[in-house]
């Protein structure tokens, strides 16, 4: 596939929101929302909705009117670096490749939410079941250009994750989740509701939320 140095990708500027400041715009719910205020959502939706609203400041929105005029500019060095950071986040064995299974989550950290069909089609085009960084840039370049809203950057997601992971062990425990929710929502959530939120987000059932589960939660 092509060389990113020879064919730099382009996309529009980003406008980050302030941490827990003014009400978020676009698709991110207000931090003041609670499950009780949203009726009786389907199982699994409530936890994602509450945590997603709390991490609303991690959402980065592209202004469509500006993006439309910026599609022809070259991708800046810091934007190439952002791709590198996202890639390295999921290159766990540091061999310079990420597998098809990690590719979807990696794409989500950059704000692109691939469908299952898209992931299947991509996996069929990947030789050897894995991609290197050059292939990743080749793949994500056009998608980053096409995105005009709801962009979530890996650095912002990592910063938001650290707000919950207070002991820095790379996982969010029940206690850490309870403390974060209490600090942000006061006493509006019961112990049972906190446990239900953790259960909804904890995909592998180990009682903890790791960064990949956190990314998937933010993609819902």
UniProtKB/Swiss-Prot annotation:
Retina. It is a lipid-anchor. The keyword Metal-binding applies. CDD domains: EFh. Residues 22-35 have a biased composition (Low complexity). It is found in: Cytoplasm, Perinuclear region; Cell membrane; Golgi apparatus. InterPro entries: CaBP1/2/4/5, EF-hand-dom_pair, EF_Hand_1_Ca_BS, EF_hand_dom. Ca(2+) 3 binds at residues 202, 204, 206, 213. Pfam families: EF-hand_7 (PF13499). A lipid is attached at residue 2 (N-myristoyl glycine). GO terms for biological process: sensory perception of sound; signal transduction; visual perception. It comes from the Eukaryota. This is Calcium-binding protein 2.
């Amino acid at each position: 596939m092509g060389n990113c140095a020879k064919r730099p990708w382009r996309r529009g500027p980003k406008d980050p929101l302030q941490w827990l400041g003014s009400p978020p715009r676009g698709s991110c719910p207000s931090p003041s929302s609670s499950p009780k205020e949203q009726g009786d959502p389907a199982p699994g939706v409530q936890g994602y909705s509450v945590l997603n609203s709390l991490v609303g400041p991690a959402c980065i929105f592209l202004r469509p009117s500006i993006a439309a005029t910026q599609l022809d500019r070259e991708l800046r060095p810091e934007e190439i670096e952002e791709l590198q950071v996202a890639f390295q986040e999921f290159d766990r064995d540091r061999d310079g490749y990420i597998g098809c299974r990690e590719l979807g989550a990696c794409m989500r950290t950059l704000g692109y939410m691939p469908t299952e069909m898209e992931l299947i089609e991509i996996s069929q085009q990947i030789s050897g079941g894995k991609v290197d960084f050059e292939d990743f840039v080749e793949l994500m370049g056009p998608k980053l250009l096409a995105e005009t809203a709801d962009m979530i950057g890996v650095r912002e997601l990592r910063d938001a994750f650290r707000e919950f992971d207070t002991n820095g062990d790379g996982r969010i425990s029940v206690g850490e989740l309870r403390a974060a929710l209490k600090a942000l929502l006061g006493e509006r959530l019961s112990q049972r509701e906190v446990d239900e939120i953790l259960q909804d987000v904890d995909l592998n059932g180990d009682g903890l939320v790791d960064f990949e589960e956190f990314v998937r939660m933010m993609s819902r």
